[in-house]
Amino acid sequence: ETDDATMTSPFDPDRPEDPLAPPPERTPLGAWVDAEDYRVRVVAVEDCEVEPYFAPRPGHRKIGVHLELTGLRDEPVPVNGLFATLLDSTGEPHRPTPAGCRPTLPAGRLEVGQTTRGFVSFEVAEDASGLLLRYQPIIVGRVPRPITFDLGR
């Protein structure tokens, strides 16, 4: 018998990791990964310069992860910076921040052969290290595997 109050949706980005799952494969900067519906790579990682009113909290900085994605299937695949999560060496997840590096990754859908690119930005501690980017779009009817990139920082 299961307790429905403790079950989490497979689409919940805050759900706990599966302790029996193998460790995620870590793709290096610049390398393409072909998922079932799309291919993706991290082009660059940069410190963001923002307007003073968007400045990070004291002791923090904003970094931008420049993503490039291409649709691989006849069915359009959703693209959105909100599908990205940044993890640091402590395992703490960081959600995207709306004010950061430009141009931002546009939200939308990619048709087969169509490519888009842009930054997804995060606010992290000045001394954050071991940064990993996990990208996992929400696709109706199934849960695509997350793709993890080693950001080399």
Question: Where on the chain are the PLM-derived regions?
Answer:
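Conserved functional micro-motifs across diverse proteins
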Residues: E1-R153
